[in-house]
């Protein structure tokens, strides 16, 4: 009651004040309130910075302590790894994280080659990788049933799923998956387990995917057979030997090295098979050397003993084969659309040879060299693998519905040629491989820096290019100039010079004999006014060399070499490139770089200028352009088309006229 009376008196006194004083009093009270709030805010700020008052001066002098933010990513898929970073795929997204400096050389983060394409727990400290725990304990088996409680595997029973398990579909486009995506009755997945539960599902392959069989050549591609094979694997692996019903198996732990020679006790039957215990396991051929070093192979390896040596055959899914073909055939730094065009070409080419095996004796469709497609010479790359996955199953078909012959080569000189250069009956039917000008507007007249190139009064157009450049004078005008509008005008191989100061007669003689043994119909001798196929006689002098016929686009098609003992006609671009290469002279490219050519000239798009001393030829100068045979897709042409905005389908439609791109599944 007294409090209320006191309050009422204060209010009465307040209202007795003049209006101006009341307003002034309100202002003072507001200022005091704001000052009090600022004081409280200041105290709170000091407290948050760790200041506890003047009684503890040592704390006020200490720098604020950083509390690290630690994040643990469970069961993520590592797609790529480098010395300073890793790229992971988790919850449908790819993300790259850099490594903490302290992890370098420590055991907390494995080496990059150990982390690539592995399941792992990744620890991040302030968004930097501080630890990686790989989960490499995997198995595979036929799936009989699956639900949220676990997965039933043939021979293993039901295995529980971890609460935080993750599933990844590795084929086609990399995506997430669950137990519901498993195919019952098939063993097309690996399972990663930890502490008795499944923590990862790796859908490695699509069921019933067709396989390709690749003959692996010896080191440096010196031979198709091996005298000894040394191998190991990055997972446990089976060695199967015997034949028929007497197949026996031995299980080896990952990292164990096995040596097989011609006298090995394992050769009870004809073949020995080495099969990784998991689908994502890889076999290393320690006795084989490639540009990448020691190659490792997906799929499984078979060893076949023959009288001459051991044939090594790698069987694996076609799509996985392409993972190692595309980076070996085209630099992984090229634009994605060019890589996709290369992937479609490579897939079509490989499938064509799966229909007609190149090595029926060894049970192989192709080998791993330039004789077919270079395979596993360069390590797989994320960009090229992406190109393969984004074009999954796509191939090129002719207008008749057959698989196209998708030949390709490195670089054009500004024009391509046709398959007629190979002098086979089949080549005559490949009418979709045309001789075309490689520039943005091929339908327009060919332009040089000084105007249109012409023979007489006829301009060279896309329609007349094959015929016009077959004429010596026209081709000479073309190849001795550069054409700024050409797609590859800035490429090193677009123009080159090869100057032989002293002719190597013995080398020419030896090469002529070798090429005659390979195909006598293409190395002819002049006798009684006609050329015919007969053995090459020795000669000691060369008196002249002349190109007597050019093919579509101006490619050298027939070459005549006159000697002191006879005159010879060399037919086909390959034979001509071989005969004129002395193995010593270096090619000088248009950018000034020099390149050794041990066995072949870069291309047969060239003109030759002999130098004579009285009656004999002492040397020759070659002005040429391009690298490769010139048939089908130019890879550097595709690169520059992609840089100018063309897509993979547009690129392929340019090089394979009238063909269609569709799924081969």
Where do the protein language model's features map onto the residues?
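Conserved, single-site charged/polar hotspot
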Residues: 2-665
């Amino acid at each position: 009651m007294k409090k209320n009376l006191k309050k009422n008196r204060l209010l009465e006194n307040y209202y007795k004040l003049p209006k101006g004083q009341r307003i002034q009093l309100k202002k003072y009270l507001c200022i005091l309130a704001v000052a009090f709030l600022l004081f409280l805010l200041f105290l709170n700020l000091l407290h948050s910075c760790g200041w506890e008052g003047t009684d503890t001066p040592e704390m006020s002098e200490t720098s604020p302590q950083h509390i690290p933010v630690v994040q643990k990513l469970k069961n993520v898929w590592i797609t790529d790894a480098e010395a300073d970073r890793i790229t992971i795929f988790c919850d449908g997204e790819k993300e790259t994280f850099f490594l903490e400096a302290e992890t370098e050389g420590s055991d907390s983060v494995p080496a990059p080659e150990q982390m690539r394409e592995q399941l792992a727990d990744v620890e991040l400290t302030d968004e930097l990788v501080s630890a990686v725990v790989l989960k490499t304990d995997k198995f595979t088996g036929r799936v009989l049933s699956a639900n949220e409680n676990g997965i039933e595997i043939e021979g293993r029973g039901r295995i529980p799923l971890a609460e935080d398990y993750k599933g990844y579909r590795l084929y086609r486009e990399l995506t997430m998956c669950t137990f519901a995506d498993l195919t019952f009755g098939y063993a097309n997945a690996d399972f990663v387990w930890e502490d008795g539960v499944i923590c990862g599902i790796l859908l490695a392959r699509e069921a019933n995917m067709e396989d390709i069989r690749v003959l692996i050549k010896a080191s440096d591609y010196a031979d198709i057979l091996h005298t000894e094979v040394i191998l190991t694997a990055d997972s446990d692996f089976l060695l199967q030997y015997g034949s028929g019903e007497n197949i026996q198996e031995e299980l080896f732990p990952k990292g164990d090295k096995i040596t097989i020679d011609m006298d090995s006790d394992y050769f009870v039957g004809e073949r020995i098979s080495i099969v990784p215990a998991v689908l994502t396991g890889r076999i290393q051929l320690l006795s084989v050397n490639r540009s990448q070093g020691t190659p490792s192979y997906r799929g499984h390896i078979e060893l076949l003993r023959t009288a001459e040596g051991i044939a090594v055959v790698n069987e694996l899914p076609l799509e996985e084969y392409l993972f190692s073909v595309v980076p070996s055939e085209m630099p992984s730094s090229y634009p994605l659309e060019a890589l996709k065009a290369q992937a479609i070409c490579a897939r079509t080419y490989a499938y064509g040879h799966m229909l007609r095996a190149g090595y029926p004796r060894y049970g192989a469709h192709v080998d791993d060299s330039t004789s077919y497609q270079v395979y596993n010479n360069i390590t797989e790359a994320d960009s090229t693998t992406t190109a393969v996955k984004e074009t999954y199953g796509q191939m090129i078909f002719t207008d008749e519905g057959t698989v196209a012959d998708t030949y390709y080569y490195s670089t054009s000189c500004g024009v391509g040629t046709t398959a007629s250069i190979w002098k086979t009956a089949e080549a005559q039917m490949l009418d979709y491989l045309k001789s075309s000008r490689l520039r943005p507007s091929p339908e327009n007249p060919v332009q040089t820096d000084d105007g249109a190139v012409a023979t007489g009064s006829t301009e060279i157009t896309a329609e007349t290019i094959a015929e016009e450049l077959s004429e010596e004078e026209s081709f000479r005008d073309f190849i001795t100039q550069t054409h700024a509008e050409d797609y590859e005008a800035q490429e090193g191989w677009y123009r080159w010079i090869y100057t032989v100061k002293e002719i190597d007669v013995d080398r020419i003689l030896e090469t002529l004999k070798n090429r005659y043994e390979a195909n006598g119909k293409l190395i002819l001798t002049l006798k009684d006014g006609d050329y015919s196929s007969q053995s090459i006689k020795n000669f000691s002098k060369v008196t002249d060399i002349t190109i007597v016929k050019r093919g579509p686009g101006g490619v050298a098609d027939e070459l005549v070499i006159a000697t002191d003992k006879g005159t010879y006609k060399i037919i086909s671009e390959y034979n001509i490139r071989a005969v004129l290469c002395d193995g010593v002279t270096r090619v000088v490219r248009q950018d000034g770089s020099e390149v050794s050519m041990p066995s072949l000239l870069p291309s047969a798009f060239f003109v030759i200028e002999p130098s004579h001393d009285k009656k004999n030829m002492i040397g020759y100068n070659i002005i040429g352009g391009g690298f490769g045979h010139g048939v089908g897709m130019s890879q550097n042409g595709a690169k520059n088309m992609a840089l100018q905005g063309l897509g993979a389908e547009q690129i392929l439609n340019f090089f394979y006229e009238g063909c269609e791109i569709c799924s081969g599944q």
